Amino acid sequence: MFVALGAQIYRQYFGRRGMAMANNSSVANKVCLIVIDGWGVSEDPYGNAILNAQTPVMDKLCSGNWAQIEAHGLHVGLPEGLMGNSEVGHLNIGAGRVIYQDIVRINLAVKNNKFVTNESLVDACDRAKNGNGRLHLAGLVSDGGVHSHIDHMFALVKAIKELGVPELYLHFYGDGRDTSPNSGVGFLEQTLEFLEKTTGYGKLATVVGRYYAMDRDNRWERINVAYEAMIGGVGETSDEAGVVEVVRKRYAADETDEFLKPIILQGEKGRVQNDDTIIFFDYRADRMREISAAMGMDRYKDCNSKLAHPSNLQVYGMTQYKAEFPFKSLFPPASNKNVLAEWLAEQKVSQFHCAETEKYAHVTFFFNGGLEKQFEGEERCLVPSPKVATYDLQPEMSAAGVADKMIEQLEAGTHPFIMCNFAPPDMVGHTGVYEAAVKACEATDIAIGRIYEATQKHGYSLMVTADHGNAEKMKAPDGGKHTAHTCYRVPLTLSHPGFKFVDPADRHPALCDVAPTVLAIMGLPQPAEMTGVSIVQKI
């Protein structure tokens, strides 16, 4: 009841906003974009709910004017080979550019040796060189890849050495959650080898488990353990020759990487002191907020430490840990200016976005570039998802309801751009129930068919794509359920007879090319921020 009422309010209020646009007649062609969730292209019939379903509409659309486009890995800003997902898919579709995830941006900087020219890193090194000559690196040292990566730390050490900072101290946070509990000693050995032999630069200053250094639940008594180790040397003392053995003894006492109590090296020199510079190198923000705020802001007071807080510290983060933090970051948030929704508003072209509850955020927040903002002339419609325990029990979900709302808009002709998401192939695909996924695909095809007929009747060009694969692989090789996304390409279809698809010159087309293609069909200019390309040309 509440969701339905919310949808009604959205329609009433935002419908008026949509009607306020004045330049809708400027478009060459009106476009209806459908994003199917979890519809990949695979010719393998085994466990393929899409191929084995009765889908005459999509069969027709994918036998005429269509293309297969990439929706996974580096093509959408994810690590190479990683399957796509709904959030990233809609970000790329709506942004008209590849939206690189932080780990990928950093990996590319490492690969291309860009750290030495990174503006914030250069700034941190200049501060250290022009001050007391001391710089600290602190973060999680492992190859877990969830919060940080050891390769990023190694690249930072090399760059800082090249940038000429006299003294570098490393504060090693043990993992044991995203890696095996006793694997830290191996990362410690790699680190010592790297500092002592590979670069001959930098000193290991402290070792402490992430349980203490990376708390995120306001357990400041935990943060205080790492804080006092870093500023005051509170912990068990050791040196480079003995620290590995200290950790092994901790393992023997059932103290694993995550829970390592502080081990202190370098004496007073390795402590965070007045006027020092600190770089935290975790790229995931949530577990860096407390320790960085304790060092660089007045949150050290929450630690209730009796030690004097060092004065004039300057903190930098690998990424932006919180918008209101005063720290510079090596990789600040990328600008998503002039995504498709914003650009249409700039062009005075109104638009309509529709989805059922499960995917409503994807056609609003994610499609709009990760912004909550609703642009001028943008109308939104929420269709309630069915209230069932699992969606295999109602595999059609609310596809018919979404189609109803889209057809209403096509008949009204108010908005030159309308788009929607169909959730069933993905949401039912995740249940692993093959027969239900077949029904989900068939229900989606019926809904698309109804919309297709309405676009033909009311003068809209229909485009159909997907955000990632899923329902085309419902069975694992051993016959068990496959419930994850896939790396298969997805379709992009176009019903307009005046355009044909062409491949970009230097790469395979991807989700980032959808928005530029929409603009080309509508006869609108493409903003400079969109680095995707239109993959159609006029016939």
Swiss-Prot record:
InterPro entries: Alkaline_phosphatase_core_sf, BPG-indep_PGM_N, Metalloenzyme, PGAM_B_sf, Pgm_bpd_ind
Active site positions: S86
GO biological process: carbohydrate metabolic process; glucose catabolic process; glycolytic process
GO terms assigned for molecular function: manganese ion binding; phosphoglycerate mutase activity
Family: Belongs to the BPG-independent phosphoglycerate mutase family.
Expression sites (tissue/organ): Expressed ubiquitously. High expression levels in the nerve ring region, intestine and body wall muscles.
Reactions this protein catalyses: (2R)-2-phosphoglycerate = (2R)-3-phosphoglycerate
Official protein name in the record: 2,3-bisphosphoglycerate-independent phosphoglycerate mutase
UniProt binding sites for Mn(2+) 2: D37, S86, D467, H468
The protein's required cofactors: Mg(2+); Mn(2+)
Organism: Caenorhabditis elegans
Listed PANTHER family: 2,3-BISPHOSPHOGLYCERATE-INDEPENDENT PHOSPHOGLYCERATE MUTASE (PTHR31637:SF0)
Regulation (activators, inhibitors): Activity is not affected by 2,3-bisphosphoglycerate.
Pathway: Carbohydrate degradation; glycolysis; pyruvate from D-glyceraldehyde 3-phosphate: step 3/5
Thermal response of activity: Optimum temperature is 22 degrees Celsius. Active between 17 and 32 degrees Celsius.
EC number annotated for this UniProt entry: 5.4.2.12
pH-related activity note: Optimum pH is 7.5-8.5.
Root EC class: isomerase
Keyword tags: Glycolysis, Isomerase, Magnesium, Manganese, Metal-binding
Binding sites annotated in the UniProt record for Mn(2+) 1: D426, H430, H485
Protein's job: Catalyzes the interconversion of 2-phosphoglycerate and 3-phosphoglycerate.
Phenotype upon gene inactivation: RNAi knockdown results in embryonic lethality. The few surviving larvae have sluggish movements, abnormal body morphology, developmental arrest and impaired survival.
Gene3D superfamilies: Alkaline Phosphatase, subunit A, BPG-independent phosphoglycerate mutase, domain B
Pfam families per the UniProt record, alphabetical: iPGM_N (PF06415), Metalloenzyme (PF01676)
GO CC aspect terms: cytoplasm
